[in-house]
Amino acid sequence: MTTTTDVLPMLITDVEVVSVERLSPSFVRVVLGAAALADFGVDGPRYDQRMKLVFPDPRTGCLSSAGEAGGSWTTTWLERPAEERGHMRTYTIRDVRGSGADTTIVVDIVLHLEGDQVGPGSTWAAVAAPGDRLVLVAPRRGFEFGGIEFAPSVGAELLMVADETAVPAVCAVLEQLSPTVTGAAFIEVPTAGDVLDVRGPVGVSVTWLVRGQAPLGQRLHDAVVGHLGIGPADVDVAADDVDPDLWETPTFSSSGEEIPATRAVGHELDGLYAWIAGESTVVTGLRRHLVNELQVDRSQVAFMGYWRRGVAMRS
């Protein structure tokens, strides 16, 4: 195992597919292994911990190797043409199994194989097989890495809202919560076959919403408004009024919005902690409902645009 002397604060390594499982029409579970994963780790719960995966270029099949990754690896990687280096995307660590050199990382990948959302991750996952190789960038034990946004205050009432792209994150969080936590999770998926078995605290209700032919996010919006029981129901958002990099947490705002140093008290929803992730337009609408209309304090919310309809995902 490496020491903390002269090593990168992140783990950059080649990994190999150990197994592939089709969980549902829209989800593929891939288990990744490498001896270097012995150095993977975070201090405390992983919750919605993010990592990076580099996929082969779908046209050429080329993929850069992590090799002896040094501090300039990312810069060197970016300088190469995409058709040679591969494509980097962000995923949630769904689970970690084993220990030492036998450590494996589980990632659930959404299959967007039609329309304008086809990407290198979906393309790769649809045909992935044991022995296939990727490059992984993840937390190294003993170093700050970031990538965990779920951070409720002690005793907060949870509200978790997700579309299919955030299902791995919600499920990972639910399985790591203290058994005394209470709240509600609303999860929208494309089909009834995408409803997965997830175990969380008995005090957290989990509602799966099947989109079917409904507009993207409509069932989520209606469920959240109904759950909160207050405020107007109309949260229509114009396409040109959406931050393509929407990412707002109690400590960060992608829009540069000033984040209050102190939180308001005495509000009807004081004690709520909302974690909302998915398509940026849907997330923007829900953000307006909670923050603008219901006046939920910014310290109580995390809004994350995991993707934007009609826009190619970036690394």
Report residues per predicted region:
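Extended, composition-driven regions rather than compact fold-specific motifs
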Residues: 1-315
